[in-house]
Amino acid sequence: MTSYVKKRTFIIFIFFTIMIFALIVRLIWIQGINSSKLAMAVERQSTADIILKPQRGNIYDVNGNILACNVPAGDVFAAPKFIKNPEKASEELYKYLNMDKDSLYKILSNKNSEWAVLGRSVPLDNINKIKSLNIPGIYVENTFTRSYPYGKMLSQVLGFTGIDGNGLYGLEYSLDRYLSGIPGREISLVDAEGRKVGLPDKLHKPVNGDNIVLTIDSVIQGYTEKAIEKAYEKYKPEDGITAIVMNPKTGEILAMANLPDFDPNNPQDVPSQEYWSNPAISSIYEPGSVFKVITASAALESAVVTPDERFYDPGYYVVSGRKIRSWTVLGDITFSQAIEKSSDTVFVQIVERLGVDAFYKYIKAFGFGSRTGIELPGEVSGMVLSKSKIYPVDLATMSFGQGIAVTPIQMITAFSSVINGGNLMAPHIVKYIENGDKIIKEYKPQIVRQVISKETSDTMRYILEKTVTEGTGRAAQVPGYTVGGKTGTTENYAPGKYVASFAGFAPVENPKIAVLVLVKNPTQNGYMGGEVAAPIAQEILRDALRYYDTVKK
């Protein structure tokens, strides 16, 4: 090797040695001497991981009126490590966040916390005030809160949502999977002032919820609520009033109302959470003489009696040595008159002819003892004695609606089947679910089963018309229209406590509307179904029929 080559090799060696030494020095400087400066620079930026709430679907009545919707609001967040003066920030913010100042200060002064939620669905006025404060480290995400434009109307049907926007009661709960939508997610870089830097690193847009269209007609709902509100003041019932209006041919619920009720915009403002439940589907009661409609239909369909067959009603009937008393002595009457004038004595004789097996077959066929499957949450199945445990006296009292417990929705559904041609219809309160302009699920009228023949149904309709024109239901007559119905009065759990009820329909020749009214333990101005519940049903039928013949036509 020449001296020139050796010299050149040595120079290259020295050059690479110097370069490697320089890199080592730089690495030591980065890791040690300047580490605090770099840490400060890194600390001046952070990421914000935000869940993007979808818009909840609206709920509409059958005419397109909005029953539940969203109004602008905001979610408020904090990045405590970016808040320079937690005490001052707490003082300025707490009044807009429904939080006490001390609790807010604990959150804002916790520098170990990356991210904190201060408020969900904060009203828009408060959001605007929070934005105007311009506090570094406080973020606002525009969102929505639930609103019920009609206030208390349909409160137990609609239910309400929680602070997180999820449904808690009513249709808001049972149809939450359609209404809620799918949340999105945004991950963004934020600076030391808590402001977003550049475009989001990741963005998954939320998918908004579906809209629900109900069978409820808010006009008929309004008539129904007005009628029971007047009655509530007049009769002062201890346990409230329930009213249901149904299209008997389709099973569509046109109105469903209960008192007492609540405002779903402020659901916490109630004496008890019981106000949130829906007695129309979740409470049970002895139906009393309204149940005679069921017994009579079963007897006529089974051909154990004819409408004109004559009976003698002495005011009592003896079963297994026990004297079962009727409410009055009616003497010589036909079976039709026994329905019109509500003879317990005759119905005990009729159910003896039917027998346990046949009677229970019809009880089951009419849907008693089973949930109807309506879209509302909290429905119960009622109480029917086991057939194997029933005694003759039990059978006798069940014939006129005692010793059996039903729900209001069961009763109006069964009653509708008696007067609609004999078909038990599945009751439903949802007409369809839509996403944009596309219907994704439709709830069509559904025949569960045919319970009685059209001939029996026709016979029952005209017997029930006479109950209103000549019998116990006279207070339900509507001038200009034919009305049929049946009254009921049941002594409740304690002496002197009664459930006054009435089930009615109109017009008799072509029923468009069926209505059931329960007044539970009225304390003044009467207690019998004919004097308390029938006038309420009359007002609902009158207003609804006029509405159908004018506006709807």
What are these regions (language model features)?
Residues 1-267, 357-369, 520-553:
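Periplasmic/cell-envelope proteins involved in peptidoglycan metabolism and beta-lactam response
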